[in-house]
From Swiss-Prot:
The efflux pump is composed of GdnC and GdnD. This is Probable guanidinium efflux system subunit GdnC. Probably involved in guanidinium transport. In vitro, confers resistance to a broad range of toxic compounds such as cationic dyes, neutral and anionic antimicrobials. Induction: Transcriptionally regulated by guanidine, via a guanidine-sensing riboswitch. InterPro entries: Small_drug/metabolite_transptr (IPR000390), Small_multidrug_res (IPR045324). It is found in: Cell membrane. One of its GO terms (biological process) is transmembrane transport. Keywords: Cell membrane, Ion transport, Membrane, Transmembrane, Transmembrane helix, Transport. It comes from Bacillus subtilis (strain 168). It holds the Pfam family Multi_Drug_Res.
Amino acid sequence: MKWGLVVLAAVFEVVWVIGLKHADSALTWSGTAIGIIFSFYLLMKATHSLPVGTVYAVFTGLGTAGTVLSEIVLFHEPVGWPKLLLIGVLLIGVIGLKLVTQDETEEKGGEA
């Protein structure tokens, strides 16, 4: 559940980052602002029970990979094998950080 908040925050990050580039009306700028608000709200909630450094690294890694992949799929950004390879390396690092990180309730041996 706690890591789910980080993943959901990263999804909203992808939305607002793409919005920064493509927003061109009050409606799309409003959507971008809403994405920023939800993204940071979920990020802050996740840091209440997970280490902030790891949460931020996972958040930015997922957001970066998601943004690049979204630009490729939705906006036909050029893609080559080096770009895909580096996204894969980034995701391996994100998964590794998640796997080696315990949340604070696990460290204390209790339920939050």
